């Protein structure tokens, strides 16, 4: 989720005053977190602490009513009267990264992404934007390859839709434009930093495109440690606490997956004889003697 936050912070000062300079200063004194970060933290908090997505978004957005760049007009009304309003805005995609990072199968990622969107952005395109973004993050995280992004683009979007993405510098705040654009920008990237620079210097809704691309880039490349440290200096303590809890959860999940892999039985086939035997988890693969438990 910190990838989305970094993209948001880097793009914040250019949202209404675009830059096309690739070499812009990433962490400038004029930068700050925007509504994209507040909503991303809210989704993470909901997952980590068993809250509903609606209640967590309402809680965090009321707590931070005036972030840099402000909330959209319809979403402001939603904060104080949380009834879905059929939006297809890119807010559904910019806040969904915790879903793609925390859940571990496609079905759950799809379902939870839809749930995060439906509370406000209940238009089919809003839901689709959230699902596509979360699925891309999930597959980038698990496969560490660009191929899933290419497959997602061809599966969810027609050629006509892909040729209709926003031009450089064109304002676009809907999912059907911003999400495929973000996926394409990632495909052109070579590193986390390069992805952020490409996103922000493309212009348009620079903080939100930065947030979406940042969330994708985090899943594929990881984040440089100095970027993490700099980004955290812009955030209040309660947001840092959620991020810390999120990172600890990711670490625990990763270690658990490693443990399960070590403890799993698996089959080994002899290439000469073609015979297959099962290696038990409690067995040393090298000398095939039982491992003594301490």
What is the predicted function of each stretch?
Residues 1-294:
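Structured, active/binding-site neighborhoods that engage oxygen-rich ligands
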């Amino acid at each position: 989720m910190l990838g989305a936050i970094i993209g948001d912070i880097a793009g914040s000062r250019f949202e209404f005053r675009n830059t096309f300079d690739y070499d812009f200063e990433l962490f400038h004194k004029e930068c700050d977190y925007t509504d994209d970060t507040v909503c991303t933290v809210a989704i993470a908090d909901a997952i980590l602490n068993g809250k509903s997505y609606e209640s967590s978004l309402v809680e965090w957005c009321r707590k931070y009513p005036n972030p840099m760049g402000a909330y959209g007009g319809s979403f402001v009304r939603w904060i104080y009267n949380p009834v879905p309003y059929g939006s297809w805005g890119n807010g559904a995609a910019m806040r969904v990264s915790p879903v793609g990072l925390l859940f571990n199968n496609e079905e759950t990622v799809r379902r939870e992404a839809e749930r995060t969107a439906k509370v406000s952005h209940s238009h089919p395109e809003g839901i689709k934007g959230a699902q596509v973004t979360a699925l891309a993050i999930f597959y980038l995280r698990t496969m560490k390859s660009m191929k899933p992004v290419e497959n997602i683009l061809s599966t969810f979007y027609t050629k006509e839709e892909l040729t209709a993405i926003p031009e450089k510098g064109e304002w676009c705040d809907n999912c059907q434009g911003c999400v495929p654009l973000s996926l394409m920008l990632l495909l052109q990237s070579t590193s986390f930093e390069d992805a952020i620079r490409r996103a922000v210097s493309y212009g348009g809704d620079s903080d939100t495109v930065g947030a979406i691309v940042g969330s994708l880039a985090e899943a594929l490349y990881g984040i440089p440690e100095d970027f993490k440290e700099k980004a955290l200096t812009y955030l209040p303590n309660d947001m840092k606490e959620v991020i810390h809890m999120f990172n600890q959860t990711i670490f625990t999940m990763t270690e658990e997956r490693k443990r399960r892999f070590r403890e799993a039985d698996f089959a080994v086939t002899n290439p000469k004889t073609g015979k297959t035997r099962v290696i038990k988890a409690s067995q040393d693969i090298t000398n095939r003697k039982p491992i003594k438990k301490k």
